[in-house]
Amino acid sequence: MICWPYPLLMNAFNNVNMAASCIITSVEFARELGIPEDKWIYPLGGAGMREKDNFWERTNFYSSEALEKSLDSALDVSGLKTEDIDLFDLYSCFPIVPKMAAHHLKIPFLDPPKPITLLGGLTSFGGAGNNYSLHAITEMTRQLRSKRTQANNHKDGRAFNGLILANGGVLTYQHVICLSTQPRSDGKTYQDGNPCPNVVQSVPGDFSDIVGSEGVGTGVWEGIIETYTVQFSRTNEPGIGFIVGRLKQTGQRFVANVGDEKTLRSLVKETGEEVIGKCGWVWKEENGTRNLFGFEKKANL
């Protein structure tokens, strides 16, 4: 286990296959170069957006506005709908990402009718630093070419479309591109500029302040867990817990470390109970700047 709930298998590996390339050119120049038309794959449209860099400024921790708007905008500017896509590659920067994307696109995640990964994502192909999604573009190109060849053999002239979702950070960066075996039927070209704003603009309705390094002040405050993780040691033991939550009295969001062993064990499911939404207590560490959290008042780690 690295950080709960992600074991080593679900974490990114930097040094995997680093080499990939693609050639992007115009129809005129492709003809001038003598590239056979059965090799051509058309980029129809794309979009990209990122969440706020400070994770504690996000609206919630169970969805991604950047992911959803990037997917919707890329499909829209490409003149496509989800049902028009034949192949997906939804990169799993963490396992939650393709689940969230599939949920937003209304694709069954456990038994999808169409492939939602071509290379296997993080588990089978590595992760951060290896430029995964350029590999996805090259693999999508190969598979779309193959589908076109098979269709031509059966006198089927329809277009085949693919969608690639690239992402990185902590659900931070999202980029989507749609590729096709045919140019757009409406004659439109790839759009000028990004249809999305660069950064998510919305903030939580009740988000006015965060309890930061100044701590929660004196006293003990009741708080609700919004999200959490636990960092494990080299000996695979829970080491330090991290909590993001809300103070019940003021609605302020707080960030805290876990203040006692019992709470720490509760976070890693030794009790079998999910703790998101559960109430506990927050206080400022004595002679320190950290907030501490525990299910019992002012417990000690």
Residue ranges, per PLM feature:
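Conserved catalytic cysteine-centered active-site region
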Residues: M1-C3, L9-M10, G48-E51, F61-A66, ...
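Condensing-enzyme catalytic core mediating Claisen C-C bond formation in acyl metabolism
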Residues: I2-S64, T138-E139, H154-R158, I164-G259
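Active-site-proximal alpha-helical scaffold in enzymes
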Residues: C22-E28, V77-L80, A128-A151
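Short glycine/threonine-rich loop-to-helix capping motif typified by GTGT followed
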Residues: R58, S92-F109, G127-Y132, V170-Q182, ...
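Extended, hydrophobic alpha-helical segments in both membrane/secreted and soluble proteins
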Residues: A66-L75, D84-A101, I137
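Phosphate/pyrophosphate-binding loops at sites that engage ATP/ADP/AMP, CoA/4′-phosphopantetheine
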Residues: L71-D84, P108, G212-G219, T263-L264, ...
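Flexible glycine-rich surface loops and low-complexity tracts that mediate binding to linear polymers
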Residues: E270-G288
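OB-fold/S1-family single-stranded nucleic acid-binding modules
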Residues: E285-L301
